[in-house]
């Protein structure tokens, strides 16, 4: 019996270890964590965090032995249930056929863990790993390990992405469902045995599909470009899903904001002027540490397109393909309207269509972001007090006897008309007093639209809220208290532990960001119906010179040393992309200055994926005046002062 168990363990491990180290094709899906994505405009280093996580999180090591024990138990049970030896022989033949590839114990165990339970694939890498390039530690990862890890995870996540892009592939959809079931089931439940058998059978099916589906990979490579430029950071498909999860959250929230703003008057132009910059906000990993977030990641494939716009426009701190363009669309002042950004809230930073409009609705979030709270102008604060007083008056008005029936009917009619052009901040709704004068009152959290997992938001109080609507409604109720003043939207997604950013890590940002911005422009320039018209004639003329340059470094998982060498050698190719990104963010108002509210949407979307983003913004504001000028922005990216030109902002 022991001999059989040992053989089963060996076979299980062999199946778990990726047998092909070939890189993805140029058209492969440039997901957020894909380690090798030549075509992607994503920034490298996502895979390093898988290794770094093993080093920084000893708890993962403790999970490995338990995973092996679980597999032994599963194989023993499956053997007792008439699992024939011929199946074992098939697995062994499959192993021999795939090739003999050496993998260190740590890597093998990591792959095994991923295969045994897709419910915790995201726990294998650092939480900071996200849409933006990971830390420089990538250069220390063995290429074979990166390739193996990528391949192992790819075999797990391939069905997920395919199920979203090609619904008619039932086998992939089945695996998606099974992966979600495994997340909700406890390893000790008897159903684990059945899931293990199904996983092994699916793996056999996946390997041939993996090898013979270049067209799928090409479609996937294009799909993320359209729907999730933010998650186009290089990494495995699994990490990509997680990224998608987070990026999709702004989109979901933007829809909620739109609904809310429609109810509460969309014409708050006068109020927005009173609130100043904070109300005119401008506009991303990773790997959640909970099974719930794993599910979010898979569901996020559909919504990520919307998030990309928000992340990208906010600020290209974390090169996530195409995250730059519409990212800033994501968050804006309390206007709750969708006119704050010119790009969509989806992570498809380059799609100037429906997602483009949805991104604009996200602008209402930035007013409440970490920095937005501190930037409230005196006018904004006085308005808060005025609204608080209005709330009390509204309550008195509601408790007092109403006018005659005829007057009441006229009042309601006038009320509807008044609120139509009267906007309130997030967490408030418009109501009218008996005289028909509109004013804002706090929204009841229970009146918020039904929230999904992807709508979750983390507040600065380290509490996870069902949605941003619930968070701002709670903040409104706490107005006048210290807790209410401090409560802001920290980032999208459930709250998690975010490590501190080191000097070494933040120093690598400009390298990855410049390359990322350049690659995004290349993608926008290439013929694509969904991207058509995004760049104007002047922009296309500038980008064309870079696109046709034979010396251009193609998108891919490049080491920091190569990025640095290319920047020195082809410096002229990076000047315009930096100016273009600044112009994309500087929208509300377009005054050649970036405020925290204009950067906030990108930050909120990327904080859970890239922990250095906040510090990066601080580094770009050396005088600490909470404003980043074009000159400061250019210096932050290593552009020479003589090459910083406002004429390039078009």
From Swiss-Prot:
Residues 436-497 form the Kazal-like domain. SMART domains: FOLN, KAZAL. Residues 91-101, 189-210 have a biased composition (Acidic residues). Its main location: secreted. Residues 54-64, 75-85, 277-299, 382-398 have a biased composition (Basic and acidic residues). SUPFAM superfamilies: EF-hand, Kazal-type serine protease inhibitors. Keywords: Calcium, Disulfide bond, Extracellular matrix, Glycoprotein, Metal-binding, Phosphoprotein, Secreted, Signal. Residues 1-16 form the signal peptide. Transmembrane segments: none annotated. It comes from Mus musculus (Mouse). This is SPARC-like protein 1. It is found in: Secreted, Extracellular space, Extracellular matrix. The modification Phosphoserine is found at residues 70, 78, 86, 155, 163, 272, 353, 406.
């Amino acid at each position: 019996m022991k001999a059989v168990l040992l053989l089963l363990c060996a076979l299980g491990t062999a199946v778990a270890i990726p047998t092909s180290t070939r890189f993805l094709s140029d058209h492969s899906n440039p997901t957020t964590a894909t380690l090798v994505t030549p075509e992607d405009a994503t920034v490298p280093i996502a895979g390093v965090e898988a290794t770094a996580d093993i080093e920084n999180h000893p708890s993962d090591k403790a999970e490995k032995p338990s995973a092996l024990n679980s597999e032994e138990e599963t194989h023993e049970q499956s053997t007792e249930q008439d699992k024939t030896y011929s199946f074992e022989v098939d697995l062994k033949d499959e192993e021999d056929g795939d090739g003999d590839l050496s993998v260190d114990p740590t890597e093998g165990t990591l792959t095994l863990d991923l295969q045994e339970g897709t419910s915790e694939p995201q726990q294998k890498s650092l939480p900071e790993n996200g849409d933006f390039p990971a830390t420089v530690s990538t250069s220390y990862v063995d290429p074979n390990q990166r390739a193996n890890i990528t391949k192992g995870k790819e075999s797990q996540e391939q069905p997920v992405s395919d199920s979203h892009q090609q619904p008619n592939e039932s086998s992939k959809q089945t695996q998606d469902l099974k992966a979600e079931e495994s997340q909700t089931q406890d390893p000790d439940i008897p159903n684990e045995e059945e899931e293990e058998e199904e996983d092994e059978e699916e793996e056999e099916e996946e390997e041939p599909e993996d090898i013979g589906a270049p067209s799928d990979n090409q479609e996937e490579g294009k799909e993320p470009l359209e729907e999730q430029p933010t998650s186009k950071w290089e990494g495995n498909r699994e990490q990509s899903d997680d990224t998608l999860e987070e990026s999709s959250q702004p989109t979901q929230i933007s829809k909620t904001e739109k609904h809310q703003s429609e109810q509460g008057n969309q014409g708050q132009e006068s109020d927005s002027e009173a609130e100043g910059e904070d109300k005119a906000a401008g506009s991303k990993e990773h790997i959640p540490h909970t099974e719930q977030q794993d599910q979010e990641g898979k569901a996020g494939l559909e919504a990520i397109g919307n998030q990309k716009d928000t992340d990208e426009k906010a600020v290209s701190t974390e090169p996530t393909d195409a995250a730059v363009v519409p990212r800033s669309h994501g968050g804006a002042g309390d206007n709750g309207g969708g006119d704050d950004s010119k790009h969509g809230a989806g992570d498809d930073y380059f799609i100037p269509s429906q997602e483009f409009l949805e991104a604009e609705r996200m602008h209402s979030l930035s007013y409440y972001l970490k920095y937005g709270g501190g930037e409230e102008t005196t006018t904004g604060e006085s308005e808060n007090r005025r609204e608080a007083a209005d709330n009390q008056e509204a309550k008195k008005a509601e408790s007092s006897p109403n006018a005659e029936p005829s007057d009441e009917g006229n009042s309601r009619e006038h009320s509807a008309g008044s609120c139509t052009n009267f906007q309130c901040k997030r967490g408030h709704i418009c109501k009218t007093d008996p005289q028909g004068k509109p004013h804002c009152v706090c929204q009841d959290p229970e009146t918020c639209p039904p929230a999904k997992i992807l709508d979750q938001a983390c507040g600065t109080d380290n509490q996870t809220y069902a949605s941003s609507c619930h968070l701002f409604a709670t903040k409104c109720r706490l107005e006048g208290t210290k807790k209410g003043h401090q409560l802001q939207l920290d980032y999208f997604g459930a709250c998690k532990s975010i490590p501190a950013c080191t000097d070494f890590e933040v120093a690598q940002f400009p390298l990855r960001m410049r390359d990322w911005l350049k690659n995004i422009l290349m993608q926008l320039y290439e013929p694509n119906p969904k991207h058509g018209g995004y760049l104007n004639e002047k922009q296309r003329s500038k980008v064309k010179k870079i696109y046709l340059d034979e010396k251009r470094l193609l998108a891919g998982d490049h080491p920091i040393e190569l990025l640095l060498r290319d920047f020195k050698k082809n410096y002229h190719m990076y000047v315009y992309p930096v100016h273009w990104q600044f112009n994309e963010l500087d929208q509300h108002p377009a005054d050649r200055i970036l405020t925290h509210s204009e950067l906030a949407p990108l930050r909120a979307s990327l904080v859970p994926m890239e922990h250095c983003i906040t510090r990066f913004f601080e580094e770009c504001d050396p005088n600490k005046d909470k404003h980043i000028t074009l000159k400061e922005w250019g210096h932050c990216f290593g552009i020479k002062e003589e090459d910083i030109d406002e004429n390039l902002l078009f």
